[in-house]
């Protein structure tokens, strides 16, 4: 109640998710001081007989390829994460049966284009066959966000700066 005037969320759209972020957000460069970040989210589903354990086991393989191609990621603030759905009854992802969200974050849209090009040219042929053994993601829906950090526990007085966007 203390902060209900600051930020409120609709109850029906909230989702219970566990998340794993294998790469630190500052590993490939810092995010802008404004708090801005660009992100792409993919809706993913386990293949029959597969589970969260398979998805979690894949993350070190993907992470290793990211680090092996670090020249292509430098300066982009690239990091990624998987949000694993707990299938809460009122969550917005329940209707679609989404098992997990694959999320990529960068410091700009141009940086995302760059990292996607690195993936397509250097990583896809290695990783995609392994990924499709346990999951598929919708290719017709990519949630794109121009986001801002609203709270930084290490900088209590942090305020996002929307002036340049």
What is the predicted function of each stretch?
Residues 1-128, 133-165:
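Short S/T/G/P-rich N-terminal loop/turn motif that feeds into the first structured element of a domain
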């Amino acid at each position: 109640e203390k902060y209900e005037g600051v930020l409120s969320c609709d109850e029906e759209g909230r989702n219970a998710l566990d998340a794993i972020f294998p790469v630190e957000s500052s590993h490939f460069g810092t995010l802008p001081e404004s708090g801005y970040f660009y992100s792409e989210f993919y809706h993913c589903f386990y293949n029959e007989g597969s589970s969260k354990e398979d998805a979690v086991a894949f993350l070190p393989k993907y992470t290793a390829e990211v680090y092996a191609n670090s020249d292509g990621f430098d300066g982009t603030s690239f990091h990624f994460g998987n949000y694993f759905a707990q299938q809460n009854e009122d969550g917005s992802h329940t209707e679609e049966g989404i098992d997990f969200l694959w999320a990529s974050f960068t410091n700009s849209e141009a940086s995302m284009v760059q990292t996607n090009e690195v993936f397509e040219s250097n990583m896809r042929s290695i990783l995609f066959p392994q990924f499709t053994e346990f999951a598929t993601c919708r290719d017709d829906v990519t949630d794109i966000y121009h986001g801002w950090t609203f709270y930084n526990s290490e900088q209590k007085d942090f305020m996002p700066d929307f002036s340049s966007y």
